[in-house]
Swiss-Prot record:
Annotated ranges, domain N-acetyltransferase: 11-165
Gene expressing this chain: ectA
Record text on subunit structure and interactions: Homodimer.
This protein's name: L-2,4-diaminobutyric acid acetyltransferase
Notes on temperature effects: Optimum temperature is 20 degrees Celsius.
Amino acid sequence: MLPDKTALPIITLSQPTAEVGAQVHRLISKCPPLDPNSMYCNLLQSSHFSETAVAAKIGDELVGFVSGYRIPQRPDTLFVWQVAVGEKARGQGLATRMLKAILARPVNQDINRIETTITPNNKASWALFEGLAKKLDTQIGSAVMFDKTRHFADQHETEMLVKVGPFKAVQA
């Protein structure tokens, strides 16, 4: 019997460490329309905020990364900063899998809401969070958070605040 050439590679998820910060920086640069951050920022996301981030790898290659943090005034809310999925791993539901992996960690069992910002024309991100809301059996809403003119001085598209929740704890 011939090997199945359509078999998908195994993608492993883990809590990131500072050692993946440079790989995160490279991955995000290859995932437009994501805004690039400094490598230092990516190092902090991978270390200080590792409980609310996830790294996805095929072997030693980083193919996905989600960064987020708990909103200080509302620690039951995860703010998702960025979701990056490399070309090699697209179309496999990896973004949803990564978000659910963060929520399923014992340390995050009290998170019952997600917030993020999405530009109006980022269809992939809208589909991701609309699909996640369905999977979590909850509602989704949006409103302007940062306006193109008022906040970005016409240098960036308007960012819509997207709210998902409330939802029940996600099990591993």
